[in-house]
Amino acid sequence: MAIANANYEFIMIDVGTNDRVSDGGVLKNTKFWNMFENNQLQIPEPQELPNFNKKMPFVFVGDEAFQLLPNFMKPYNKQVLNDNRRIFNYRLSRARRIIENVFGILASRFKILQKPIKLSPTKAKIVVMACCHLHNLLMKQKNYIRNGE
């Protein structure tokens, strides 16, 4: 489970849950969820968007597996879509692509993540966390160029 910002950097990583658990189930077993439930995340106060006179809250964007909660957005059920909801789902999906793209960049940088890691769960967790931290470091290096580019 991970959360990324608009700069394609991880801001929260939780590694080690069995892949058979749903995203919603994984979330409830994270330190992030515990902090969220106990109001310890220090989510900024709502702010005005550019050219928009109304204050909007900061939110986390999830998929259908997540619960709809304050500061959490998820798509409308596909069974009850009208045009406005379809547009909303499309735009929410564009926001969700950030984390999907971050995982794509991560996997393309670190080939070890493209197949099952043949290490103990403890060591595999360390490898994944190290890859995520190195990814963030590389994202901050604006002049980083991969070999062959």
Question: What are these language model-derived features?
Answer:
Residues 1-149:
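Short, well-ordered secondary-structure "scaffold" segments embedded in the functional core
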